[in-house]
């Protein structure tokens, strides 16, 4: 038995990959038919940036050459929208705002979106997954994001909303706007990623304000990119879209993690530890009920390394958790390994303590975090399956 284990530990995925490539290069009579079916099965993903912050996020994704997703920017500010590089842009509220923005009034942002609802419905149709991203607290993003999420939901799309909450220095009015917008957005989101900008300051404590905002854009973009790559990157072991769909709709608090090894050392464990490390908010992954993770590695990744990562994840989460995993070979990675993780059912004290302390008049936030049950009563602080949305805490 030991001899077999020793042998397997030396087997490179490269050997499997070469054989797989040889088979893939074949020209069987059924290949054309399979290819035609495959093209119809591709997951259609759109990322819609709402307002200035959301538009900046899709601009960053454009600069980073995100693949397998259409990028769209929507804003009331014609000048800012003009500076965004993405191909698809929509200026909303030409009658309401005349292209000059909303004056930080979410109601005006909402009216501007409703004014262009026909165009918005065309954008979100025939889409499997719609990302709605915005910096909450201002007028356009806060007001129009829920309108867009609702249109996408009604069109049959899974809706993943990825937003930031304001820095404390931006004042109480923007926080008031943000939490009201968050509550509206939650009603039409299958998954809601809420990133408190104040927590980002621990990452860039002495940065200028513009640098802090740019870092917030990066965190949003990295979060979206990780989910897109989990869904779309094909490989030796693929993650089925239907599994992802089930997890996204399964309810509960969730965590998204991403990690990449550096040169030398135990690369698979380095990447995994980085993916599981909570940089913004402390979470307990031992309660996770679903875990989706993808390893993206060079061809020399070994069976032993993959098994080691699997064993480590099993140690950290609930033994009854469902684990869905995939492996993609990327020759451009040289010797590095990337790990992407998505877990649902994790828990965090942040949900009831830190959010409320960040917002002195915390009734709105408390109601969002706890949700309400079918009878309209305030639910317990831990989010359960009957709550109307998922809150994702990002690492």
Swiss-Prot record:
Protein family according to the UniProt entry: Belongs to the FtsZ family.
General function of this protein: Essential cell division protein that forms a contractile ring structure (Z ring) at the future cell division site. The regulation of the ring assembly controls the timing and the location of cell division. One of the functions of the FtsZ ring is to recruit other cell division proteins to the septum to produce a new cell wall between the dividing cells. Binds GTP and shows GTPase activity.
GO biological process: FtsZ-dependent cytokinesis; protein polymerization
Protein name per Swiss-Prot or TrEMBL: Cell division protein FtsZ
Residues that bind GTP: 52-56, 139-141, 170, 174, 217
InterPro entries: Cell_div_FtsZ, Cell_div_FtsZ_CS, FtsZ/CetZ, FtsZ_C, Tub_FtsZ_C, Tubulin/FtsZ_2-layer-sand-dom, Tubulin/FtsZ_GTPase_sf, Tubulin_FtsZ_GTPase
Keyword check for GTP-binding: yes
Keywords, comma-separated and alphabetical: Cell cycle, Cell division, Cytoplasm, GTP-binding, Nucleotide-binding, Septation
Record text on subunit structure and interactions: Homodimer. Polymerizes to form a dynamic ring structure in a strictly GTP-dependent manner. Interacts directly with several other division proteins.
Classification via Pfam families: FtsZ_C, Tubulin
GO terms for cellular component: cell division site; cytoplasm
Location in the cell: Cytoplasm
Entry keyword Transferase: no
Organism: Thermoplasma acidophilum (strain ATCC 25905 / DSM 1728 / JCM 9062 / NBRC 15155 / AMRC-C165)
NCBIfam families in alphabetical order: ftsZ (TIGR00065)
Top-level taxonomy: Archaea, Methanobacteriati, Thermoplasmatota, Thermoplasmata, Thermoplasmatales
First-listed, main subcellular location of the protein, grouped into a coarse class: cytoplasm
GO molecular function: GTP binding; GTPase activity
PANTHER family in the record: CELL DIVISION PROTEIN FTSZ-RELATED, MITOCHONDRIAL DIVISION PROTEIN FSZA
């Amino acid at each position: 038995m030991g001899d077999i284990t020793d042998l397997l530990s030396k087997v490179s995925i490269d050997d499997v990959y070469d054989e797989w490539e040889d088979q893939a290069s074949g020209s069987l009579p059924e290949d054309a038919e399979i290819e035609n079916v495959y093209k119809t099965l591709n997951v259609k993903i759109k990322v819609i940036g709402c307002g200035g912050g959301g538009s900046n996020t899709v601009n960053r994704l454009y600069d980073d050459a995100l693949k397998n997703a259409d990028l769209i920017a929507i804003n009331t500010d014609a000048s800012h929208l003009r500076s965004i590089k993405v191909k698809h842009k929509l200026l909303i509220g030409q009658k309401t705002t005349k292209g000059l923005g909303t004056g930080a009034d979410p109601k005006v942002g909402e009216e501007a979106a409703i004014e262009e609802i026909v165009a918005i419905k065309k954008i979100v149709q025939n889409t499997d997954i719609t990302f709605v991203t915005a910096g909450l607290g201002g007028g356009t993003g806060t007001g129009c994001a829920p309108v867009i999420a609702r249109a996408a939901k009604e069109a049959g799309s899974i809706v993943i909303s990825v937003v930031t909450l304001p820095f404390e220095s931006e004042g109480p009015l923007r926080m008031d706007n943000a939490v009201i917008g968050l509550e509206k957005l939650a009603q039409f989101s299958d998954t809601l990623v809420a990133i408190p900008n104040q927590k980002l300051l621990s990452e860039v404590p002495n940065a200028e304000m513009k640098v802090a905002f740019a870092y917030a854009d990066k965190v949003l973009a990295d979060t979206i990119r990780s989910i897109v790559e989990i869904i779309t990157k094909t490989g030796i072991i693929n993650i089925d879209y239907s599994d992802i769909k089930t997890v996204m709709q399964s309810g509960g608090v969730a965590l998204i993690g991403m990690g990449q090894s550096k040169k030398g050392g135990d690369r698979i464990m380095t990447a995994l530890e980085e993916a599981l490390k909570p940089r913004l908010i402390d979470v307990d992954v031992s309660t996770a009920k679903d875990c989706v993770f993808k390893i993206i590695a060079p061809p020399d990744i070994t069976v032993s390394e993959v098994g080691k990562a699997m064993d480590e994840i099993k140690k950290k989460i609930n033994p009854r958790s469902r684990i869905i995993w995939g492996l993609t070979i990327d020759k451009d990675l040289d010797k590095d390994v990337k790990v992407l993780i998505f877990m649902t059912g994790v828990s965090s004290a942040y949900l009831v303590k830190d959010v409320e302390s960040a917002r002195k008049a915390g009734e709105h936030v408390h109601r969002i975090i706890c949700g309400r049950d079918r009878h309209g009563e305030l639910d317990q602080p831990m989010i359960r399956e009957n709550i109307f949305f998922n809150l994702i805490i990002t690492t």
